[in-house]
From Swiss-Prot:
The active site is at C301, H385, E387. Residues 225-412 form the Glutamine amidotransferase type-1 domain. It comes from Coccidioides immitis (strain RS) (Valley fever fungus). Coiled coil: none annotated. Its main location: mitochondrion. This is Carbamoyl phosphate synthase arginine-specific small chain. Its EC number is 6.3.5.5. Pathway: Amino-acid biosynthesis; L-arginine biosynthesis; carbamoyl phosphate from bicarbonate: step 1/1. GO terms for molecular function: ATP binding; carbamoyl-phosphate synthase (glutamine-hydrolyzing) activity; glutaminase activity. It is found in: Mitochondrion matrix. It holds the Pfam family CPSase_sm_chain. Small subunit of the arginine-specific carbamoyl phosphate synthase (CPSase). CPSase catalyzes the formation of carbamoyl phosphate from the ammonia moiety of glutamine, carbonate, and phosphate donated by ATP, the first step of the arginine biosynthetic pathway. The small subunit (glutamine amidotransferase) binds and cleaves glutamine to supply the large subunit with the substrate ammonia. Gene3D superfamilies: 3.40.50.880, Carbamoyl-phosphate synthase small subunit, N-terminal domain.
Length: 468
């Protein structure tokens, strides 16, 4: 179909004619019913990117026509903008890309894999509140693409600006630190009349991205049952567990997991956005979990920070954070260096770790803590993302280490209790339903596949509420 629209354009030798003529010819072809091109940028409005107490940058809008504010952060990732922008860890932030050209391979479809997990995104929606690029591709080309970056931003209601000096923006953020900023769309910009700067870290962002109700994923060949605490979990984290044979039950971030821990073989704490100190309920629940259970535990990113707080350590805010796909992290147990994918503005203060914990990884760029491990128990966590998406898979083996400890724990429990009834208790059965081979993926706006029965229609059952 698109070839019909292309035929309305003059031969390549005549493409030197005025852009207005080309646009007029194309619009005429559209009026006849031929499809539009893969870009929504014909007459972009003026847009302004303003850093609080800092410079003002003027460019062109290619997203939603509205004004927003948030924390301005930057990523040096060369590729993976669909994964980055859909990462719940970016909730409340305006993402500045250092890569000069963004959008050249478009935005893929919301296709799901055999377990109902999104193939190309890390959540069902665009999580960043704003997008800043030097140059946006008006034409895209990739076999998975179904729309342009501009069309995605407009559909998701996210403002975006191009044509600004991202080198100057990143230099400012690097020198002054992550700052509050806003994107204003319109020809007339008046700083005095524009909306105030809003600090997203003053609110509990995790509560906005965490699942509202527990759900279950059973790959059909399950060899272990893992409880996942959803603080804004990425799809590829769930996929990394399921593809290794784990059956998982995902709980809201503030669910009292210690109440049902004995029904699981391990606990996993996910990534998420914002200040970890906002999640005091989660910290309390993790502390109680470690007191009453010997379950293997693994945490990633925010999960690493929450586990550290539960252990008694402290967290600190970094000047401008680490957001890239090429950050070196040293494994202190083996001396090996891994190239890692990272997205965080806070870090664990390794000097405050209790005596029964030790650092696991260290950042070779800024010497910040990248992981910790318990000296005697199967508990560890990393600040970086071993599941990547995007980024390298150097450290994906950590999922194997974790699930190996889960298997050993499961076998030890079977040895101690050889006659233990493997059927779930009424409490857990009430939560999960009787038979759930398949997936229910009600994360945010995700819908349940028609072929799979729903796991939980209401947020929490009366039995579960009483137990909590």
């Amino acid at each position: 179909m698109f070839s019909k629209a292309l035929k309305s354009f003059p031969p390549r030798a005549n493409w030197a004619m005025k852009p207005q003529v080309l646009q007029a010819r194309f619009m005429a072809s559209v009026a006849k019913g031929t499809p539009k091109p893969n870009s929504a940028i014909f007459a972009p409005e003026r847009a302004t990117f303003t850093i609080r107490d800092g410079p003002v940058f003027h460019g062109k809008s290619f997203g939603a026509k509205k004004n927003i504010s948030g924390e301005a952060v930057f990523t040096t990732s060369l590729v993976g903008y669909p994964e980055s922008l859909s990462d719940p860890s970016y909730r409340g932030q305006i993402l500045v890309f250092t890569q000069p050209l963004i959008g050249n391979y478009g935005v893929p479809s919301a296709e799901k894999d055999e377990n109902g997990l999104l193939k190309y995104f890390e959540s069902p929606s665009l999580q960043a509140v704003g997008v800043v690029v030097a140059d946006v591709a008006e034409k895209y080309s990739h076999w998975t693409a179904v729309e342009s970056l501009s069309e995605w931003c407009i559909r998701e209601g996210v403002p975006a600006i191009s044509g600004v000096d991202t080198r100057a923006i990143v230099t400012y953020l690097r020198e002054q630190g992550s700052s509050l900023a806003k994107i204003s769309v319109g020809e007339e910009y008046d700083a005095d009349q524009d909306e105030a700067f809003v600090d997203p870290e003053q609110i509990n962002l995790v509560a906005k991205v965490s699942t509202k109700a527990p759900f279950h994923i059973n790959p059909g060949n399950s060899n272990a049952h893992v409880a996942v605490i959803d603080c804004g979990v990425k799809e590829n984290i769930l996929r990394s567990l399921v593809h290794r044979g784990a059956s998982i039950t995902v709980f809201p971030y503030d669910f009292p997991i210690q109440k049902v821990a004995h029904h699981f073989d391990g606990v996993f704490i996910s990534n998420g956005p914002g200040d970890p100190t906002h999640c005091q309920k989660t910290v309390h629940n993790l502390r109680k979990l470690m007191e009453v259970s010997q379950l293997p535990i693994m945490g990633i990113c925010l999960g690493h920070q929450l586990l550290a707080l539960a252990a008694g350590a402290r967290t600190i805010k970094l000047k401008y954070g680490n957001r890239a796909h090429n950050i070196p992290a040293l494994d202190l147990t083996t001396g090996r260096c891994h190239i890692t994918s990272q997205n965080h503005g806070y870090a664990v203060d390794a000097s405050t770790l209790p005596s029964d914990w030790k650092p696991y990884f260290v950042n070779l760029n800024d010497s910040s803590n990248e992981g910790m491990i318990h000296k005697t128990r199967p508990i560890f966590s990393t600040q970086f993302h071993p599941e990547a998406k995007g980024g390298p898979l150097d450290s994906s083996y950590l999922f194997d280490i974790y699930l190996d400890s889960v298997q050993k724990y499961k076998q030890s429990q079977a040895a101690f209790q050889p006659g233990r009834d493997s059927r779930p208790s009424p409490l857990l059965a009430d939560l999960l339903g009787n038979e759930r081979v398949g997936v229910q993926t009600t994360i945010g706006t995700q819908s349940t596949p028609e072929s799979v029965a729903p796991v939980l229609e209401t947020p929490i059952s009366p039995t579960m509420a009483a137990a909590a």
